Amino acid sequence: MTPLRFVFGIHQHQPVGNFDHVFEEHTRDVYLPLLKLLAEREFFPIVMHLSGPLLEWLHSNHSKYLDLVSDLVASGKIEMLLSGYYEPILAALPRRDRVQQIGWMHEAIESRFGVKASGLWLTERVWEPELAADLSEAGVRYVLVDDRHFLISGFQRDQLHVPWRTESDGKYVDVLAIDERLRYLIPFRPAAEIASYVRELRSAGHQLAVFADDGEKFGGWPGTREWVYDKGWLRDFLGTMEKLVASGEIVMSTCTDALGAVRSGGLAYLPTASYREMEAWSLPSAAATRLGKLETELGAGRIAGQDGAFIRGAHWRNFFVKYPESNRAHKKMLALSALSRQRGDPEEARRAIGRAQCNDASWHGVFGGLYLPHLREAIWLNLARAERELRHGESLAAEVVDFDADGNDEIWVHSSRFSAVVSPVQGGAIVEYTVFEDGVNYADVLTRRREAYHEVSAHPVAQEKSDGVPSIHTLEQSMTLTELPAFDPHDRALFVDRIVSIADNTTIRSWAHVALAFAVVGPGEIVCKGDGIEKHFRFADDGSIAVTWMWDPARFDDNAAFATEISLSRPLDIEADPTATRSTMQVETVAKSERGFERTVQGESITLGWSASLGRAALRIRPYSRHSATGMEGRRENGAPTPTRDELHAPLPPT
């Protein structure tokens, strides 16, 4: 009987803007020990993907790791995989940007490892059919996707242990299916169980089995370091696989070797897809709850079976619908990418845009970094760098444009020093306020939303006892909350206006969801009005903003106050009439991560109020001078020290 070709692939990535200590800990605890043990046991050949942000950090901080990889590549023991260099979701990029991102990775691999790569690790396995043409144009011969992508199209599992070919616009790329069962077995189950499955595949006459998954599974996920290293799983696994090789049952293979040795299954057209959990995470909260109930009714056995692929969630791009914060960053990236192309694509701006295309801060699940302020900050920092380069020397201007692609116009105000977006359909709130010198979008405060897991966490799924270690998705189901967290009735922004009762602060009237008529009366002057309020913005070239409100005081009694809420990611200088009241609170979210539920400070809410009987209010905001003793560094609006990024993100105590 012919040996089964076994492909062992590891993908290793850290996002743009992640903490230095996270890079360091993963290199020390995961990347180095894994590679050293693979080399010690000669468990080769394998395939490997290193993302651009991780490559850059390793080059500066752990070049010996890259030297080891380079030696193994040179000896034919490692086949390197491409991706978009800064680990973008390729489907979410303009087509030219996709090809350029892959081109950067081509250059990096050839420069550092001396080889031309031809296979692609598809970030988060987010596939769209048109990608085939762009991958082919970028010099990609083959791409790895989940076997589920095929199952959704009606393929049988038994058909997936061979390469397939797909096409778009007359261009072709080969597709290899990653075996989902292997992903769930490795490294969570004993080596003997994995060997049994591999033998089962060979006995069925299959020629190829592909495992490719996160390298962080081998010591970076909760509980895995003890299991993989201290309890000896990795040594047991390598020893077991060595015996399978020695007995002629399997042969280790690269993807390229497999393409040459295993005949193609033919033509396959795959639908838009990602992995099962990702599609569930992208659903709105209510829909995700319904999907969970449906899966429970069908039972784990049926979901894991052939029909389970037809029970699925939403498109990855639905995160842009679910989270406006993600959408704004994405649409800002698209706008700047187009502007950069129009202006000759200066290298500094293009690289900053490329870094801002890193995927992690765009989505949220048990993985995903949308809830992590430092990852969103890194995206906005790079967008600020790009826009500063592109707008050098520009004077103040305002554009009326559907900035967020929601069918409603916004006003984009910008100069050589700042960029801001006013949303008339949100009562004239400012939804972006980026100061280029600071590299900060001060409006980047995540809204507190009800997530599906907030509802179900009071009824966790019990973990079955086993002789393995639970996967991250099993741990996800067992997390619990003792109480539901607070959530916001509207999206957070700058200048969200309402009338409140002075007695108990309850809202009498809110303009958060009111669409106001608007007019741009000058380069930096905007008027929004309607439904009993008139709101004037005056933007200065240096980025300061003066806001004036007018309303009919006769519409409200003497016990009412006009209030505007300003949600800030970092402190700003706020000048208001001394008679204005002022209250502050931290904006904290409670979200699920691979470590459990975590409480994260997203920013600060500052509410200023005036008696409604006045009929008028005004204030001015501006960034603190970096050269001032009361500057942005080291203080908050209420005078308290600015917390470090580590202090902003902390786990909840066990429940």
Stretches with model-predicted labels:
Residues D97-E124, R199-F211, M550:
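CE4/NodB-like, metal-dependent polysaccharide N-deacetylase domain
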Residues D402-F403, S510, A515-I533, D541-T548, ...:
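Beta-strand-rich recognition/accessory modules
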Residues V425-G427, E432-D438, T447-R449, D531, ...:
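Acidic (Asp/Glu-rich), glycine- and aromatic
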Residues Y65-L82, G103, V115, S136-D174, ...:
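Acidic, His- and aromatic-enriched active-site or binding-groove loops in soluble protein domains
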Residues G103-D158, K217-F237:
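Catalytic domains of cell-wall/extracellular-matrix polysaccharide-remodeling enzymes
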Residues E24-R28, R96, Q100-G103, S416-G522:
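Acidic-aromatic substrate-binding/catalytic surfaces of carbohydrate-active enzymes
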Residues T2-L32, A39-R41, L160-R165, K171-V173, ...:
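Active-site and substrate-binding clefts of carbohydrate-active enzymes
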Residues P3-P94, Q100-Q101, S118-L122, R141-D147, ...:
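Short, well-structured secondary-structure segments
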